[in-house]
A protein has these predicted regions:
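A short helix/loop element that forms part of the nucleotide-sugar donor recognition site in Leloir-type
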Residues: 42-61, 115
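Acidic donor-binding loop of glycosyltransferase active sites
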Residues: 142-156, 169
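Glycosyltransferase donor-sugar binding loop
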Residues: 36, 71, 98-113
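A charged, aromatic-enriched C-terminal amphipathic alpha-helix characteristic of glycosyltransferases
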Residues: 211-241
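Conserved donor-binding/catalytic core segment of Leloir-type glycosyltransferases
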Residues: 61-78, 84-87
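Active-site donor-binding acidic/aromatic loop of nucleotide-activated sugar
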Residues: 107-112, 125-134, 140, 191
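Conserved acidic donor-binding segment of nucleotide-sugar-dependent glycosyltransferases
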Residues: 185-197, 205-209
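A short, active-site helix/loop in glycosyltransferases that binds the activated sugar's phosphate group
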Residues: 4-31, 36-40
């Protein structure tokens, strides 16, 4: 990974990790954030009535509810257990809240059983739905009041949170990893310290009453990522005296 003329890192977190764990000249490292397409995830996207009718048919328990969503495969470090405690704190004031846990349980059957037992223990059986792995995550996020990122370990980047922000849906996230870097740019008020569940509850209550304004994502875009990638290759080619990418394309 560190043998190239240049090494692209997808976040400051990964830059730090590489420098701390590999012998490499820091000048080789080039930060290039991952990006999302504004055509696929347009700001203020509204789902179709056809999709909504199908959704309510499949999940009637979500009709006329305040939807809070935690996407991500079901595993201990993704924070589904913290999410349940957040929902428990919210329903005291907003009993019409419904939490969606979106993600594949894979081989984590034991943890899934633990989560479902916690749902019963906390009296959340009418307020939580496990909807499994979904291809319509964009639509699900678009009907959500807030999307959560509660991973207990820092993520290299965290694509789902960026997709939500790009749609104009607020994100509450633990303040570490690549997700922190996204929110610093687009919604810094959504950051809370890792494990501070009461802070997540209080911020959720505040945002349900008055949703925050989100900056349009003009920073973490697919086009910008692609252009930056090409620029890295262009620079390497020029430094080696081999012309330019444009000339090579014509060959």
């Amino acid at each position: 990974m560190t043998k190239g003329e240049k090494v692209i890192v997808v976040s400051e977190m990964i830059r730090k990790y590489v420098l701390e764990n590999y012998k490499i000249d820091r000048r080789k490292l080039v930060l290039n954030y991952r990006g999302v397409s504004d055509k696929i995830f347009p700001f203020n996207f509204k789902t179709s009535q056809k999709w909504l009718r199908k959704w309510h048919k499949d999940f009637p328990q979500t009709r006329n509810k305040i939807i809070l969503t935690l996407p991500g495969r079901i595993t201990r470090w993704k924070g589904q257990d913290d999410f349940l405690i957040v929902i428990k704190g919210i329903i005291k004031k907003y009993p019409n809240v419904h939490g969606l846990i979106v993600g594949d349980e894979g081989k984590k059957l034991k943890f899934t059983k633990e989560l479902k037992a916690l749902v019963i223990e906390h009296g959340l059986d009418q307020n939580i739905s496990f909807v499994g792995n979904r291809k319509d995550i964009k639509e699900i996020m678009s009907i959500s009041k807030i999307v959560f990122s509660l991973s207990k370990e820092p993520e290299a980047f965290g694509r789902i949170s960026l997709e939500s922000l790009s749609l104009g849906i607020p994100v509450i996230a633990y303040s570490h990893g690549g997700v922190k870097e996204q929110l610093i740019k687009l919604l810094p008020k959504g950051l809370i310290e890792v494990g501070k569940i009461n802070d997540a509850v209080n911020l959720t209550l505040k945002w349900i009453a008055k949703p925050p304004k989100i900056k349009k994502n003009n920073f973490f875009t697919l086009n910008k990522m692609l252009q930056n990638t090409l620029s890295v290759y262009e620079k390497v080619i020029k430094e080696k005296g081999e012309g330019s990418l444009d000339k090579k394309r014509k060959c």
